[in-house]
Amino acid sequence: MSIMLKKWNELAEVKAELAARDWFFATSGNLSLKVTDAPLTFLVTASGKDKRKQTSEDFLLIDADGKPVEDTHLKPSAETLLHVEVYRRTNAGCVLHVHTVDNNIISDVYAQNREAVFSGQEIIKAFGIWEENAEVRIPIIDNYADIPTLANEFAKHIDGDTGAVLIQNHGITVWGRDAFEAKKHLEAWEFLFSWQVKRLLLQRAAVPLVD
């Protein structure tokens, strides 16, 4: 099996798993998986596709400038430049971006803080943090309509081979050294977002909570 086909199948599997969670509302979201380092190439989801379906045109191969390697009628996802920034600056192998109701709520509620902070949850161990009552933070950036501007702002928060950024009312982007790690971190963040949204609702309803 060629490296290209292997990577295609791997990304298709991730897409299917996230689609099963219904995380691709109205064709939103984008995914990518690095294929080669030198030169940099990666597979990225094609723009405007229903990601709940599996087709032969789900992905296209992209270069270090965010351009298709071969002539194609397909267009790469709108936020492909964000993926480029991650691959240029780190050794990450996979980037995942999804819009969910919970991550949009969290990005809106904590927008003025420029970050959301979570602590005391067992799921934080998914990030490799094992301290008791550990804390994790995720930056929140403004949602710029101009993608190069958005990519420049996003790039300020890329500081390792794994990471995550919330874009206000525009979903979460997570990256990891491989698809398994990126998906694991995405699932952990979404768990924390869902937990916090429900916690805020209970607090508003004046339901006693145990800290």
From Swiss-Prot:
Its EC number is 4.2.1.109. Its cofactor is Zn(2+). The keyword Zinc applies. InterPro entries: Aldolase_II/adducin_N, Aldolase_II/adducin_N_sf, MethylthioRu-1-P_deHdtase_MtnB. Zn(2+) binds at H97, H99. GO terms for molecular function: methylthioribulose 1-phosphate dehydratase activity; zinc ion binding. Transmembrane segments: none annotated. Coiled coil: none annotated. One of its GO terms (cellular component) is cytoplasm. Pfam families: Aldolase_II. The keyword Nucleus does not apply. GO terms for biological process: L-methionine salvage from methylthioadenosine. It is an enzyme of class 4 (lyase). Binds 1 zinc ion per subunit. Pathway: Amino-acid biosynthesis; L-methionine biosynthesis via salvage pathway; L-methionine from S-methyl-5-thio-alpha-D-ribose 1-phosphate: step 2/6. SMART domains: Aldolase_II. PANTHER family: METHYLTHIORIBULOSE-1-PHOSPHATE DEHYDRATASE (PTHR10640:SF7). Belongs to the aldolase class II family. MtnB subfamily. NCBIfam families: PRK06754.1, salvage_mtnB. Catalyzes the dehydration of methylthioribulose-1-phosphate (MTRu-1-P) into 2,3-diketo-5-methylthiopentyl-1-phosphate (DK-MTP-1-P). Homotetramer. This is Methylthioribulose-1-phosphate dehydratase. It comes from Geobacillus thermodenitrificans (strain NG80-2). The gene is mtnB.
